[in-house]
Structures are given as C-alpha cells and as structure tokens.
Amino acid sequence: MQYPILLTIFLLLTNAYAQLPGKWQPRAPMPSARTEVAAAEVGGKIFLIGGYDKGGQLVEEYDPVKDSWRPRAPMPKPLHHIGAAAVNGKIYVIGGYISGVGPVDTVYEFDPGTDQWTSKKAMPTPRGALAVGIVGGKIYAAGGVTTNGRNTPANEAYDPAKDIWTRHASMITPRDHHAVGAVDGKLYAIAGRINGNHDRSIGDNEEYDPASNRWRARAPVPSVRSGIAAAILSGKIFVFGGEYGRRTHDHVESYDPTSDKWQRWSPMPTARHGLGAAVIGNSIYVISGGPKPGATFSSVNEMFTP
C-alpha cells in the first residue's frame, strides 16, 4: 500500500533534482589521476598543481580552446593540500604537506611564460589543507592544519610585489579542507573540517574585511562538507563537491554575498573531493579529485556553465 506513495515521492524528488539550473559537459581528462590538487588560471589556461599519488610535483596545463593538456615544469618539492593563486600572470603555491614530513611554510612562484619556479619568502605559519584568496593584489592564507596536527586560526597575507608577509585578524572558526573566495574586496571562508577529522565537517561561512581587519559570520553553506573547491563567477562563490563522513558529494551551491543567500545548482556528474576549480569565460572547469573518501584518484575534467 505504501509503494505508490514512496514511488511518487521518489519521482518528485528526482524531477526537482533534474530541474536544477546549470549545465555540465565532459572535457578532456587530465593525463594523470590525482587528488588534493590546486588549480589556477593564467592567460586563459588552467594549471593543475601537485596532489596525491605520483602527482606531488606534477604541473599540467589545460587549454580549453583546444581541449588538450600538456606538461609543465614540475614543482621544486612534492606537495599536496596546497593553496594556489595567480597574481599578475604568475602562480603562487603556498604551504601544503610533504608526505612523511608534514605541513610546510614554503612559497613558490611559477612563471608560465618562462616555465620556471622560484622560491619566495616563507609563510609565518607552516600549514597544509589551507585556503587562499586574493584582495588588492595580496594573497590571504587562512586556516589549515599546522605542525601540532591541529587547526590554526592564522590569517596571513602575502604581497608578491614586495615578497613580504603580514599577519591579520585570526579566523573566528579555525578549520582545514575549506575554501576561500574573494568578492568585492572581502574574503569568505566556507565549510571545511575540524582538526582534519572527516567526521567533523562544518558549514560555517565567515566574511573577512581587510579594510577593517574584522571577521563576521554569514549564512552557512546548506550542505555540510569539506575537501571542497570554489570559484568566483558573476559575483557569486560556487562551491563544488567535497566529502563528509564516509561519502563524497556531487553538490553544487553558490553564495551571493549581496543577499547573504545560497542557491543550489545541477549536481556534478562525478562526485569528488580534493578537486580543483578555475574559471574561463562564463564556465567553471572542475578537475581531478577523489571519487571515494580518502586517498582515491581521478583525472576527471568537467565543465560547468550556470
């Protein structure tokens, strides 16, 4: 007697899920299968950097026009759980882990034009599984796991023009495996987990204003998760994938800082955590990541257009 009711509910939920906005398209897979990578865009190309498996030093460049990949100069050290950001045509790789060593304070600059790496001023607080965002030409590194195996609330800014670091107001909620996005001169630290614990993921969303050097709480992400990727498009922060407990997620949600509201979008075709995301034109490319919780790997490259 209950079967028709359950079937009706299932069909309604399936239909609602199918009607979520946004379109996904498969693109050329990355040559290597990895997870816990970072992605950055320079000159209309996407650079996938570091990660688990044999990809710790790998850098691969994706050309969305040709839908093809090519190798670039490897990083000086094998790193995963790094932060990466592009400023003035160069990519800065900040912190991360070296397997068997732990969190590091290193900063490396990559110049795509010369295909060369340069060591820069070390970060004050060694950490991995951090997140970075850019405001006013400076790269803010927030949170992560430091050398004692616990979260740090550190919020430190790197100025590539001067090669110096400055300390700023600590995060309200220290975390790792989160994302940071910058919109209209403010940073948003979204989701993550506590002290690296898969079962302690959070949905907290906190805004940092560099002008006032203050944090404040904003609307939390509807889907609690960690190991996410984020990208900025049309003034919104799009959050992709992640994991929580014993499963990975295909969720896509965007945050509008103006309205302080979240919106759901069409789910990822391939659920993943530890993935990278970068914007080209009006689309976001979501690449690599683990399809199962823990150390699993993929070469998936999927293009999302809102």
Question: Residue locations for each model-derived region?
Answer:
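Kelch-like beta-propeller repeat domains
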Residues: 16-306
